[in-house]
Amino acid sequence: MARTTPIERYRNFGIMAHIDAGKTTTSERILFYTGVSHKIGEVHDGAAVMDWMEQEQERGITITSAATTAFWTGMDKSMPQHRFNIIDTPGHVDFTIEVERSLRVLDGAVFVLCAVGGVQPQSETVWRQANKYSVPRMAFVNKMDRTGANFDKVVEQLKARLGAYAVPMQVPIGAEDGFEGVVDLLKMKAIHWDTASQGTTFEYRDIPADLVDVATEARSFMVEAAAEASEALMDKYLNDGDLSEDEILSGLRERTLKVEIVPVFCGSAFKNKGVQAMLDGVVHLLPSPADRPPVQGIDENEKEDTRDATDTAPFSALAFKIMTDPFVGSLTFFRVYSGTLNSGDQVYNPVKSKKERVGRILQMHSNNREEIKEVRAGDIAAAVGLKDVTTGDTLCAQDKIITLERMVFPEPVISMAVEPKTKSDQEKMGMALGRLAQEDPSFRVKTDEESGQTIISGMGELHLDIIVDRMRREFNVEANVGKPQVAYRETIRKSDVKSDYKHAKQSGGKGQYGHVVIELSPMTEEDRKNDSVKDDFLFINDITGGIIPKEFIPSVEKGLRETITSGPIAGFPVVGVKVKLVFGSYHDVDSSEMAFKLAASMAFKQGFAKASPVLLEPIMKVEIVSPEDYLGDVMGDVSRRRGVLQGQDDSPSGKIINAMIPLGEMFGYATSLRSMSQGRATFSMEFDHYEEAPANIADAVTKKG
């Protein structure tokens, strides 16, 4: 089957924003104007097409990025048909992983901002993520009809807070209740959209007299930005004092693709004004897959390799989302970077070293789907029934293997225990959590060996709330959630501590006899290089002359290793200890493996108590990005949490504070940081090392244990 739309007319873009910028309403209008959605879905009554999971409709925030295909022939229907693959991304801080995941597979982005609220903290996080992947973007200042709307203020914030070179493409006509339309600076005409047709028809009018000067000034700024794209354009601009419409667009496009400028549009999605012109901007200014550099990866010999965005190149794609669909089972969303794939073809997954057959391929329109027979370079689609694919895996041709850059997912920052409410929920809970973890790599599940509890970890409290909520709704599993636990460890500080224990029982018949003398010491750096170190514990057999027969030595080691899984202080694992077996005795008849195992275990417990035992706590490496205004409060709070400041850096979003903070002090931190900084500070943390816990903490943990 031939390609219906040339790849140059594809636009794979995401709609990005913070909560309440009107992102979902904007996406809805895009679907309406591109002719996909016949009744406009309003987020206010919970019926938006893009927000298709139940909780999203209830909470009014977007959780899952749904991929949708739509077509556009321009606001005045005069363009050749362009194919849009639109990815709706969540704006809540607990879902930054979803944003990161969709940015990886996009070519461009539309950044939706609220004309009243402007650049919000979450906008800063999302902007930083877009910079990381060098995503060309344009901005849409939405909600121009709201009280307090101020277009110029938002453009200034784009420059000041995000360090963006913002270039307005329009000037609003009026604001708040008086918002009527926009001035198109390219054509120098006012655009008025027809309310009766919900904005599907429009007319050009003359610019209102009071806006002529403002528009003229804004236009020269725009033309100058375009002229800076190349020497040829700059020469023409300097000689003629102006550029043609095509020249302006080509200059602006070139600079947008290089992520040098951010063109800015405005409107009110709710009032059906402005989205249509912004879509024309997507066509004129955002890249097609062919405009982006060839995708990079490594071949089977670990050498760098690339794939061009053409149908004839070997097939390569990236799985960027896994979803469980109640009707078709597992859906794998993937972006095709090169080549062609037909339903029924086999693909190779180099990350798992497995072949998979692609059954049905679905083109998604929000949660409606259309079955298609093939996909080509630039397409975004969903495959049904791939078994071993996880988010971030590559799918490629078997004879031309390439592994595309894997997505790096942050470590979860919050954990808590979950237990099923009833016995019948037990098995279902395991299956449900497994499914959810496959869908979302930032969510982890493990069984705590010490407590036997199931521990779930994620990116924030809301993230885990929603996981528990989804278990209930989608898998009918009712669960109780507990308070998070910290994984402490135990060790000793004194060296060469001798411990002598004799396990002897004679009560008629065969008795039990095992006698060991051990020496306990903290492990040194030199000890750690020893190949016998396992689970941060070293056992050395120093017995000579058969004082203890060879066959009983493994039992001594086994007794020690079993004991260290639950330390004598509070039942946490013992780490960093070296034990030497130096002496002992045995009985010809009564000695057994069990007797030596018990003797070793008791000798260790007694010796551990004499060797200055201490409790270790996990220390997290924390990075906080905070605007200057809140720096004092944030740093004071770090000290209150027993944190040690490691240094500061500057960034466009404010100060970056690096600190080491005990994990036990970090619970509820996301919430308190948010309230301390009015939601403008963000943080990330990862485990760094274990350190001795202060006496008061150790006492509290021991009492609990």
Curated annotation (Swiss-Prot):
Residues 290-309 are annotated as: Disordered. GO terms for molecular function: GTP binding; GTPase activity; guanosine tetraphosphate binding; translation elongation factor activity. SUPFAM superfamilies: EF-G C-terminal domain-like, P-loop containing nucleoside triphosphate hydrolases, Ribosomal protein S5 domain 2-like, Translation proteins. Keywords: Cytoplasm, Elongation factor, GTP-binding, Nucleotide-binding, Protein biosynthesis. It is found in: Cytoplasm. GTP binds at residues 17-24, 88-92, 142-145. GO terms for cellular component: cytosol. Gene3D superfamilies: 3.30.230.10, 3.30.70.240, Elongation Factor G (Translational Gtpase), domain 3 (3.30.70.870), P-loop containing nucleotide triphosphate hydrolases (3.40.50.300), Translation factors (2.40.30.10). Catalyzes the GTP-dependent ribosomal translocation step during translation elongation. During this step, the ribosome changes from the pre-translocational (PRE) to the post-translocational (POST) state as the newly formed A-site-bound peptidyl-tRNA and P-site-bound deacylated tRNA move to the P and E sites, respectively. Catalyzes the coordinated movement of the two tRNA molecules, the mRNA and conformational changes in the ribosome. This is Elongation factor G. It comes from Xanthomonas campestris pv. campestris (strain ATCC 33913 / DSM 3586 / NCPPB 528 / LMG 568 / P 25). The lineage of its organism: Bacteria, Pseudomonadati, Pseudomonadota, Gammaproteobacteria, Lysobacterales. The gene is fusA.
